[in-house]
Amino acid sequence: MAMSQESLTFKDVFVDFTLEEWQQLDSAQKNLYRDVMLENYSHLVSVGYLVAKPDVIFRLGPGEESWMADGGTPVRTCAGEDRPEVWQVDEQIDHYKESQDKLPWQAAFIGKETLKDESGQESRTCRKSIYLSTEFDSVRQRLPKYYSWEKAFKTSFKLSWSKWKLCKKER
């Protein structure tokens, strides 16, 4: 059986709920959904899918605004309604953001270059790592000056298993 070699996108692994379906989920199910979507996204990033974190990860559900605005407060709630699950999840997102620096899947791959780690020590790698954040501006600032923003994102970020093995042998 021949398998397709098409690239996956976040939409391919994204589960969409109707507003009615979303409202029937309890807070534990909503948290599980968020965790699974974050994991799906992290897997795509780990294989070279370079894009800002989709807003859907930081949303309560279809038709609702992002959970976080400037400073991490919910953007929209019903008038006079306290939404404790929003605040609870907001705290979890803060914890997640704090732990992001420790997660290996944050790196996306740009090209073969010599890198300097945070201590300034050079190392030869097969792909240049760019550490992602939830904002494109942060990624843009970390791109080398000789990469144009447009060129970097039009470039294919596919890294086949055979190339990966070859890179490991070169180290």
Swiss-Prot record:
SMART domains tied to this protein: KRAB
Source organism superkingdom: Eukaryota
InterPro entries, A to Z: KRAB (IPR001909), KRAB_dom_sf (IPR036051), Krueppel_C2H2_ZnF (IPR050169)
Pfam families: KRAB
CDD domains noted in UniProt: KRAB_A-box
PROSITE patterns in the record: KRAB
BP GO annotations: regulation of DNA-templated transcription
Chain ranges of the KRAB domain: 8-79
Tissue-specific expression: Expressed in brain, ovary, testis, prostate, tonsil, heart, bone marrow, colon, breast and kidney.
The protein, known as: KRAB domain-containing protein 4
Species annotation: Homo sapiens
Name of the gene this protein is made from: KRBOX4
